[in-house]
Amino acid sequence: MKSKSIMVQGTASSVGKSILCTGLCRVFYKDGYNVNPFKSQNMSLNSAITCDGGEIGRAQYMQAEASNKVPSVKMNPILLKPNSDRGSQVIINGKVFKNMDAVDYYKFKPQLKKDVSKIYNKLSDESDIIVIEGAGSPAEINLNKEDFVNMGMAKIAKSPVILVGDIDKGGVFASIVGTMMLLKEDERKMVRGVIINKFRGSYEILKPGLKMLEDIIKVPVLGVIPYFNLNLEDEDSATDWSKFNFNSKGDIDVAVIKLPHMSNFTDINPLKMYDDVSIRLIEKVEDLKNPNLIIIPGSKNTIKDMEYLKSSGMNSAILNCHSNGSFVFGICGGFQILGSKIKDPNNIESNITSIEGLNLINSVTEIKTDKTTTLTEARDKIFNCNIKGYEIHMGKTLIDDNNSNFLVINSRNEETCNDIDGAISKDKRVFGTYIHGIFDNSEFTRKFLNLIRKNAGMDEIKETPKDYWEFKNEEYDKLADIIRNNVDMKKLYEIVNEGIDETDN
């Protein structure tokens, strides 16, 4: 039996589609439905790994968690990871296909559309309700041919559509009306409701505008969701970076270097659970100052980002901070940057075949053609804590001094192993690892933060915060409550149950 479905599309990127879909998944799950998320094509540098080693968008992973489901590549069959201004690494069904520029990818869309349809139908057979997320805007009229992301996907799924607009940026009425005007007549009929997102102010003042909007587009406004702050992971390329900074009064000043090709910046999210941590996102050398901890995050183009660090002077600033007592922590691409040299003999990332790193760790990385994507379990060699995370990298890093290895890996994708990962500098103030999600591990993170506190002459904090998964579950429940309290759920369920009649499209 095919599932019911509801599709969330937006007037633009970053209007809140991913978060709204996450909340709807949680609502339907809490109401007793077998719910699954789906996004046919995601473009993001933040990804996650499924239990079988497949790579999917971080948003669909989060939506699966909210649905109490094991994340699967069926939830996001196509993932595009930009690695240049005009091209992306194309991942199909969780595995790297190849790098493609926009023109070649556009030619490939007809085949992908067929594949997406088959995968969606398989997921539909396993579900009561599927929450489908669109991408960008359905009004990108130059991309309508062979579309399988927005209205094209709604037609494949025969799904009613909810259109979301972001009022916080201004112009929400124009963006909604303009989007509806640019849709084809059969597509407009599929839009069954509108949600206004990120509202601040008086609802009574807004209310007349909602009525006028309904009169113009002949579609009901199902709800107005207030602007809120929950600690949920963001993956959008149009991320509001101002939200990245956190708790300016924290004892431990953490500076995160904003690399041009930064990826998997969700690694930083768990640090927001710690009251003694302050987080700053650093773009300019003069803003770095002298933090307790510098984090160099993941990168989709490590060599280009190392080149940026040198040209901007950020490399010298990081080295000066380390000389003055700062800890430095590199994750994945950031780990590669910490080393002596990064080699790319096959020009996978750029036309630069070799570049010097920060030389904070005596290591050499070579970019390979094969990609490692694993769920990983390990123990660290300094605190002896269990670590769970995931690896996504195309580099292999060799450490000259084996005694400086950071972690011992005991399983990858549930297969037992005995491998080493990462490195710790001789002064024990530089740490590097390939394992994303390392700060999700509360026991390790608290001990690591206490090491920084001790180095700065501060007392240790004994209390370990709650498990990060427990923390995320609470955030999903709060999100579901926000949706229930601000969206006409009775009307929404009617839309889901009515579906789309074959004659509507």
UniProtKB/Swiss-Prot annotation:
Keywords for this protein: Cobalamin biosynthesis, Glutamine amidotransferase
GO BP terms in the entry: cobalamin biosynthetic process
Matching CDD domains: CobQ_N (cd05389), GATase1_CobQ (cd01750)
Active-site residues from the entry: 332 (nucleophile), 436
Pathway annotation: Cofactor biosynthesis; adenosylcobalamin biosynthesis
InterPro entries in UniProt: Class_I_gatase-like, CobQ/CobB/MinD/ParA_Nub-bd_dom, CobQ_GATase1, CobQ_N, CobQ_synth, GATase_3, P-loop_NTPase
GO molecular function annotation: ABC-type vitamin B12 transporter activity; catalytic activity
Segments forming domain GATase cobBQ-type: 251-444
SUPFAM superfamilies: Class I glutamine amidotransferase-like, P-loop containing nucleoside triphosphate hydrolases
Function, as annotated: Catalyzes amidations at positions B, D, E, and G on adenosylcobyrinic A,C-diamide. NH(2) groups are provided by glutamine, and one molecule of ATP is hydrogenolyzed for each amidation.
Entry similarity comment: Belongs to the CobB/CobQ family. CobQ subfamily.
Protein name per UniProt: Cobyric acid synthase
Protein's organism: Clostridium novyi (strain NT)
Taxonomy of the source species: Bacteria, Bacillati, Bacillota, Clostridia, Eubacteriales
